[in-house]
Amino acid sequence: MSLLTEVETYVLSIIPSGPLKAEIAQKLEDVFAGKNTDLEALMEWLKTRPILSPLTKGILGFVFTLTVPSERGLQRRRFVQNALNGNGDPNNMDRAVKLYKKLKREITFHGAKEVALSYSTGALASCMGLIYNRMGTVTTEVAFGLVCATCEQIADSQHRSHRQMATITNPLIRHENRMVLASTTAKAMEQMAGSSEQAAEAMEVANQARQMVQAMRTIGTHPNSSAGLRDNLLENLQAYQKRMGVQMQRFK
């Protein structure tokens, strides 16, 4: 795996699934391929994206700044600086300085990532902030190692919370989770339908699922009534895809 492929993998792992993730993936590909060279426009686009947490925006802003060639005097962006200040915690800043000194001695991506993984997410963010604000310099490879270590920690905590959701036994939470997943699956079906001949059929199935979820939420239903709702929807989606000659692996 090349360095940039690895960076793209780690960064995308912390972004919630949806149309925005696909858009960000495209931006990263363009940036890494040298196709997008307007850093200012890129940062303006990033700043106004919905859904993303400030820290995720900070990490993406840091990656764009590292990768896109820019004029020397280009202003640093406040939204990135605020996201990478370690919540203003002086302990994070102290640890970030210690980490920075260690990173100065590293020359490889993997070496930097290994060193960085033993620090907290707050310290890692602060260390990125130091480099972003030009208070310290490391090689691009080392900076990418720092980015990937931060993403790995964030992805780990997200994975833990997903696992907790999967093992929750509270029927009300499970019921609501099934309905939310059914809604997002319906949305995906509508987006994939496009303008094909069978699009109307896919839209109809998605629409019925939405109406069912809406009705269940409006009148209130027994928590078990949503069981199988998302699975039925997925079966419909996969049958539709087979006819379209599209195979969507691991949608579940």
Curated annotation (Swiss-Prot):
Q: Which GO terms describe its biological process?
A: viral budding from plasma membrane
Q: Name one Pfam family in it.
A: Flu_M1_C
The intrachain disulfides are none
Query: What is the protein's quaternary organization?
Result: Homodimer and homomultimer. Interacts with NEP. Binds ribonucleocapsid by both interacting with genomic RNA and NP protein. May interact with HA and NA. Cannot bind NP without genomic RNA.
Positions of the region Membrane-binding? Answer: 1-164
What this protein is reported to do is described as:
Plays critical roles in virus replication, from virus entry and uncoating to assembly and budding of the virus particle. M1 binding to ribonucleocapsids (RNPs) in nucleus seems to inhibit viral transcription. Interaction of viral NEP with M1-RNP is thought to promote nuclear export of the complex, which is targeted to the virion assembly site at the apical plasma membrane in polarized epithelial cells. Interactions with NA and HA may bring M1, a non-raft-associated protein, into lipid rafts. Forms a continuous shell on the inner side of the lipid bilayer in virion, where it binds the RNP.
**What is one GO cellular-component annotation here?**
membrane
Alphabetically, the GO molecular function entries are: RNA binding; structural constituent of virion
Membrane topology for this entry? Peripheral membrane protein
Q: Where in the cell is it found?
A: Virion membrane; Host nucleus
What other remark does the UniProt record contain for this protein?
Most abundant protein in virion. When expressed alone can form virus-like particles in transfected cells.
Taxonomy-wise, where does this protein's organism fall, top ranks first? Viruses, Riboviria, Orthornavirae, Negarnaviricota, Polyploviricotina
* Organism this protein belongs to: Influenza A virus (strain A/Goose/Guangxi/345/2005 H5N1 genotype G)
- Taking the first listed entry, what is the main subcellular location of this protein, grouped into a coarse class? virion
* Full protein name: Matrix protein 1
Q: Keyword Transferase on this protein?
A: no
